Amino acid sequence: MSTTPNIGFISLGCPKNLVDSERILTELRTDGYNIIPSYENADLVIVNTCGFIDSAVQESLEAIGEALEENGKVIVTGCLGAKENQIREVHPKVLEITGPHSYEAVMKHVHKYVPRPERNIYTSLVPAQGVKLTPKHYAYLKISEGCDHRCTFCIIPSMRGDLDSRPIVQVLDEAKRLADSGVKELLIVSQDTSAYALDQSKENQNKTVFWNGAPIKNNLITLCEQLGSLGIWVRLHYVYPYPHVDDLIPLMAQGKILPYLDIPLQHASPKVLKAMKRPGAIDRTLERIKKWREICPELTLRSTFIVGFPGETEEDFQMLLDFLEEAQLDRVGCFKFSPVEGAVATEMADQVSEDVKEERFHRFMQVQQRISAARLQQKVGKTLAVIIDEIDEEGIIGRSMADAPEIDGVVYVDNLSEQEVKVGQVISVSITNADEYDLWGTC
């Protein structure tokens, strides 16, 4: 009697890569393979890599090396897989290498080295929504691949290609399956969410298709309207500041999607933004932020910035600090510029020293922590909707509409027993305390 083959799996990198991992795992289970969390008893190991910055490349190479040492039979996929020579130079014994979102190629290689079982005992166990690596109450929904921008600090287009939007009906069908399975929050991701469908012809964008018996158009605003009809939280990530983003704010004000906008602005100095090949009209950005908040006062704005970009002067950096003070963003991430092999910025003149990067990073964070603390303090005394993420002997932890999982803060809920609530439930919490990242409250 043949035994069911075991496949070990390692997933690294961002939420977009996690979605790719979920797709591969779903294919593996559908084909009858058993997924295990260890190398020891695996017939083969798949490593889904990240290659965005040098530290991610190093982490991926170390994971590949560990899998080879512990098991010996390894297939590599993901963003770093687009640089096959770099992997082969360090790990020549890797069996096969594919680039990102190469699901069919990965499965072809798996079948080559570990033939699919004749009898599939898992077919009936694969859920309609597929295998998910997130908790049952939230899921990432990827609406497109690739990116048409050529930011000088980034090599993603060279690994994931140009923008390729999924058909709107396909996206909505997946969203409905997730909602029907019990998912309470959808996190919309892509390399450039606001560019959804812009890679398609005007004819295709304006073409009427049908979903749930209703005629719809193929564009971001329609997509968000339809996602909002599912009756669950819908959160937008990686939103490039196109003009039509303004049209999303009324949907947030109406409660159709969460009042949360993740816009990676990267800097505030026009000179630095030009060198990055990013939009440079920072005054216009401030005007838009003011208008957005007038339309939707509950709007949470998250952004990310890079300090120490080549050529960044003290004057440029001060412009960034001044922007933080004026914009009063709610959630902010900051990265020190990291040279990436293949990125234009890596070869630019006037590289900033590591000491200066570190010093500017800490100054940046001091300013933003003060701003974030003040904005969270304004929530004390208010009652917020909170989705429960964790319940254990130490208490209950959830997130408000202003908090995305893993990257934002949390809400610690007191005076509530684990018998009274369950993970994924949305409850009302009265906020009693705040710091620069998190909130505390009671029911």
Curated annotation (Swiss-Prot):
The keyword Nuclease does not apply. GO terms for cellular component: cytosol. Its cofactor is [4Fe-4S] cluster. It is found in: Cytoplasm. Gene3D superfamilies: Methylthiotransferase, N-terminal domain, Nucleic acid-binding proteins, tm_1862 like domain. [4Fe-4S] cluster 1 binds at C14, C50, C79. Its main location: cytoplasm. Its EC number is 2.8.4.4. GO terms for molecular function: 4 iron, 4 sulfur cluster binding; aspartic acid methylthiotransferase activity; metal ion binding; protein methylthiotransferase activity. CDD domains: Radical_SAM. Residues 133-374 form the Radical SAM core domain. The keyword 4Fe-4S applies. Residues 5-115 form the MTTase N-terminal domain. Residues 377-443 form the TRAM domain. It catalyses: L-aspartate(89)-[ribosomal protein uS12]-hydrogen + (sulfur carrier)-SH + AH2 + 2 S-adenosyl-L-methionine = 3-methylsulfanyl-L-aspartate(89)-[ribosomal protein uS12]-hydrogen + (sulfur carrier)-H + 5'-deoxyadenosine + L-methionine + A + S-adenosyl-L-homocysteine + 2 H(+). Belongs to the methylthiotransferase family. RimO subfamily. This is Ribosomal protein uS12 methylthiotransferase RimO. It comes from Actinobacillus pleuropneumoniae serotype 7 (strain AP76).
